Design a protein with these regions (language model features):
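12-transmembrane solute porter fold
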Residues: 31-47, 52-54, 67, 224, ...
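Interfacial helix-cap and linker-helix signal at transmembrane-aqueous boundaries
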Residues: 59-60, 91-92, 177-185, 240, ...
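Transmembrane helix-loop junctions and nearby membrane-interface residues
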Residues: 116-123, 206-212, 240-246, 268-275, ...
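Peri-membrane helix termini and adjoining interfacial loops of integral membrane proteins
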Residues: 201, 444-453
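Intrinsic disorder in cytosolic terminal tails and internal cytosolic loops
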Residues: 2-29, 484-504
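Transmembrane-helix bundle of Major Facilitator Superfamily
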Residues: 22-207, 342, 351, 357, ...
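Generic alpha-helical transmembrane segments of integral inner-membrane proteins
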Residues: 79, 83, 106, 110, ...
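Hydrophobic transmembrane-helix bundles of small-molecule transporters
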Residues: 2-5, 12-15, 19, 161, ...
Length: 504
C-alpha cells in the first residue's frame, strides 16, 4: 500500500485555507473562548455515556424496565451515535461545520429535556436515540471547527491538548457527576442538567464561532453511500451491544454481523464508482489518519477497561458507593488535566507526536497491568491510586498527539469527514472493547465459581483478566504508533524557540 504524504505541523497550517480564513476574522481571546464552548459541548456528550450507567438501577425501578429492556437506555444512544458519525462529518464539509454543530447540539439539548421528562420506557429510549443522533453530528464536526480556529502550531497543539483532556477525562467525570445527581436529587436530573448547558452552548457558538463557508460547498451528497455506511455501522453496533446477551456465536449475532459486512461491502463498491463519494477511499491511504484510527480502536478499548471495569471492581469487590467511585477517579483526572492543558502541547512541540504518544500509551498499559494484582480487600492508596496516576499520565500524554496525527494529513474540504472517521474508530473501539472485556470477565468469573472460589474472589479474578487484556490493547496501540506513525514534527526553530514557550 502506498501512503499519502504526511505533512509536518507547519505544513498542515500553511495548507489550511479554511483555518486561515477563520483565524483572520477571529481575535485570539475569542478563539480561546470558542474552544471552551466546543469543549463544553464535547464534555456534555461524553458525559452522557457514563453518567447514565450510575443511574440505571434508579431508572429501572422507576420506569419498570426489565433487565433486558434496560440495556436499551444505553444501546439506543450508542446505536444512533455510532451510526451517524461519518455522515455527520461529511454533512459538515458540505453545508458548514458551524451550522451542523449548532443543529447537532440543538437536537441533543431538546432530546435531553425529553429524557428528563420521560415517564414511560418507550419515550426515554426514543429520546436517547435522538440524543445519540445529535451527539454524533456535533462530535463529528467539533474537531474540524477547532482545527480551523487555531493556525499556529503551538496554539493548535495546546488547544488539541485541552480538547483531548475533555474527550478522555469526561467519562470518569460522568461517574462522579452521575453519583452526585442520583444520590442528592434523582435520575431525571442527569438529563435535565444538559438543557441549560446546551442552550448556553448554542448561544455562545452563535456569538463566538465565526461563520466560514463550507470547504466542500457545492458538492453533492452521496445518498446511496450515506445510507449504506450508516446502516452498516448501526448493524455492527447492534450486534456488538447485544453480543453478550444473545451469545457471540448465536444465529442472531452472526446474522447481524454478516448483514453489516455485506452492507459495508456494498458501500465500498458504491464509493469506488460514484463521481463524488461520501468517503473518498483515497482518504484511507493517508498514513497517519489510518494509523491514528487503528490506535483509536485499541486505545478506546483500553480506556473502557479503565472506566467500566475499574468502576465495577470498586463497586462490587470493594463495595464503594457511586459517589466514592467518582471520587476515586479524581486523581487520574487531575493529572490528566495538568498534562493535557499545560504540558502535552510542549511535549508535542519539542518531540513531535510519536514519542509522547508511545510513552503515554505505555504508561497507561502499565497502569492497567498494576490493576491485575488488585486484591479483594484492596486499599485505595496502595492498590488503586498508583494505577490511576499512571493512567492519568498516559491519557494526558497520548490524546493530544493521536488527534493531531489523525487530522494532520487532511485538507479542509474533508476535515469533517476525517473527524468523523477518527470519532467512529474511538466509538467502535470502545463498544467492541467493552463487549469483549465484559464477556471475558464474566466467563472467567463463572469458571472460578465453578472451581470453588467465592463470589467476590471470582468477580475480582474476572476483572483481573479484563485489566490484563486492556493493558495488552494499550501496549499494542503503542507498538502501532511507534512503528507505523509518520512523524509530524515542527520545524526546529519552533520546537526550541519562542512558539514552544508560548504553549504554557
Amino acid at each position: 500500500m502506498s501512503f499519502g504524504r504526511s505533512p509536518g505541523l507547519t505544513d498542515v497550517i500553511a495548507n489550511s485555507k479554511e483555518a486561515d480564513s477563520m483565524s483572520e476574522t477571529t481575535d485570539s481571546r475569542t478563539r480561546w473562548l470558542a474552544l471552551y464552548v466546543l469543549c463544553l459541548a464535547s464534555l456534555m456528550i461524553v458525559l452522557d455515556v457514563t453518567i447514565v450507567g450510575v443511574a440505571l438501577p434508579s431508572i429501572r425501578e422507576d420506569l419498570g424496565f426489565s433487565e433486558t429492556s434496560l440495556a436499551w437506555v444505553v444501546n439506543g444512544y450508542l446505536l444512533t451515535y455510532g451510526g451517524f458519525l461519518l455522515l455527520g462529518g461529511r454533512l459538515g464539509d458540505l453545508f458548514g461545520h458551524r451550522r451542523l454543530f449548532i443543529l447537532g447540539i440543538s437536537a441533543f439539548t431538546v432530546a435531553s429535556l425529553a429524557c428528563g421528562l420521560a415517564t414511560t420506557q418507550w419515550s426515554l429510549v426514543a429520546a436517547r436515540a435522538v440524543q445519540g443522533l445529535g451527539g454524533a453530528v456535533a462530535s463529528a464536526v467539533s474537531l474540524s471547527l477547532m482545527m480551523g480556529l487555531f493556525t499556529e502550531p503551538a496554539d493548535r497543539a495546546k488547544a488539541m491538548g485541552i480538547f483531548g483532556f475533555v474527550a478522555s477525562g469526561g467519562g470518569s467525570i460522568g461517574v462522579l457527576l452521575g453519583g452526585i445527581l442520583t444520590d442528592t436529587l434523582n435520575w431525571h436530573w442527569i438529563f435535565l442538567v444538559n438543557f441549560p448547558i446546551g442552550v448556553l452552548v448554542v448561544l455562545l457558538t452563535l456569538r463566538l464561532v465565526p461563520v466560514v463557508p463550507a470547504a466542500a460547498a457545492g458538492g453533492r451528497l452521496d445518498l446511496s453511500g450515506a445510507i449504506t455506511v450508516t446502516a452498516s455501522l448501526m448493524l455492527a453496533v447492534y450486534a456488538i451491544v447485544n453480543g453478550n446477551e444473545k451469545g457471540w456465536t448465536s444465529v442472531q449475532t452472526l446474522a447481524v454481523l454478516a448483514a453489516s459486512a455485506a452492507v459495508f461491502a456494498a458501500f465500498l463498491t458504491i464509493e469506488s464508482r460514484v463521481r463524488v463519494p461520501l468517503v473518498p477511499l483515497r482518504l484511507f491511504r493517508l498514513r497517519n489518519l489510518s494509523t491514528a484510527s487503528g490506535i483509536g480502536v485499541l486505545w478506546a478499548a483500553a480506556m473502557f477497561a479503565w472506566f467500566f471495569m475499574t468502576a465495577l471492581y470498586l463497586q462490587l469487590v470493594l463495595d464503594y458507593t457511586p459517589l466514592q467511585i467518582g471520587l476515586a477517579f479524581l486523581p487520574g483526572n487531575v493529572i490528566m488535566g495538568i498534562l493535557s492543558i499545560g504540558l502535552s502541547a510542549k511535549l508535542v512541540m519539542r518531540y513531535g507526536i510519536k514519542k509522547p504518544l508511545t510513552t503515554g500509551l505505555l504508561l497507561a498499559s502499565a497502569g492497567l497491568a498494576l490493576l491485575v494484582r488488585a486484591p479483594i480487600d484492596g486499599s485505595f492508596v496502595v492498590d488503586v491510586l498508583p494505577s490511576m496516576i499512571l493512567l492519568g499520565l498516559g491519557a494526558g500524554m497520548a490524546f493530544n498527539p493521536v488527534l493531531l496525527a489523525a487530522m494532520g494529513d487532511v485538507e479542509p474540504a474533508e476535515s469533517g469527514l476525517a473527524s468523523g472517521v477518527v470519532n467512529t474508530s474511538f466509538m467502535m473501539g470502545g463498544a467492541v472493547g467493552l463487549a469483549v472485556l465484559a464477556s471475558v470477565a464474566a466467563s472467567r468469573t463463572n469458571t472460578l465459581v465453578d472451581t470453588g472460589h467465592g463470589q467476590i474472589a471470582a468477580l475480582a479474578g474476572g476483572y483481573h483478566l479484563a485489566f490484563l487484556i486492556g493493558a495488552i490493547f494499550a501496549a499494542g496501540a503503542a507498538v502501532i504508533g511507534a512503528t507505523l506513525l509518520r512523524e509530524s514534527a515542527p520545524a526546529p526553530e519552533e520546537a526550541h524557540g519562542a512558539p514552544a514557550a508560548e504553549c504554557a
